[in-house]
Amino acid sequence: IEYGIQHEANHFELLKIKYKKHITINPNQSAEKKCAETIKALKDGYDLIYKAYFVDNNFRGEVDFLLKTKIKSKLGDYSYEVYDTKITKNLRPKHVLQITGYSYLLSKIQGFTPIKMYLIDGANITHDFKVSEFLDYFLYTKDNFEKFLPTVEKIDLYPEKCTFCNICPWLDECERIWVG
């Protein structure tokens, strides 16, 4: 996890050299405040937004970077594309699905689906993907998940340990259940 945070921070330092008008959304505040700050930063037309945060019903996303493009949107004569860093050199489908979700959430605000989205791997290689090639699958998965949620008996849920536990905001709650 520490390597991933450092990898992301290194790219932020590099991007700040190229994109002078930048902002960091404070990650240590409520989801509502992070989302409001992100929307304000989008409307204010920053060239680089670090740690952008989106919420839409059952979905949320914290994007490493949003970079401004010259493609018009409801924000103005510009729009944004998603860039996310991964420490691994072997990108996986789940990484592409993740940035597709971010691009979907971004499209709800800017009124325009980004054309491309990007992953920067652990070897510092930037991989670009067409959002349109993955959006239908993401929406299909999202729709099925939303249909599934009401059918779940919440009393039957039990958290399973996974590789994301160390960075999950629910870790304290899960540990309470595991110990109890």
Role assignments for model-derived ranges:
Residues 61-71, 76-89, 102-104:
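Conserved catalytic cores of phosphodiester-cleaving nucleases, focusing on short active-site segments
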Residues 47, 64, 79-81, 114-118:
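Beta-sheet entry/capping signal
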Residues 97-101:
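Conserved ATP-binding subdomain of kinase catalytic cores across diverse folds
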Residues 55-56, 87-96:
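Short, charged/polar micro-motifs that form catalytic or ligand-binding hotspots
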Residues 90-94, 105-178:
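Metal-dependent nuclease catalytic regions and adjoining charged, substrate-binding loops involved
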Residues 1-75:
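Metal-dependent nuclease catalytic cores that hydrolyze phosphodiester bonds in DNA/RNA
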Residues 15, 19, 103-106, 110:
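Hydrophobic, Leu/Ile/Phe/Ala-enriched alpha-helical segments that form helix-helix packing faces
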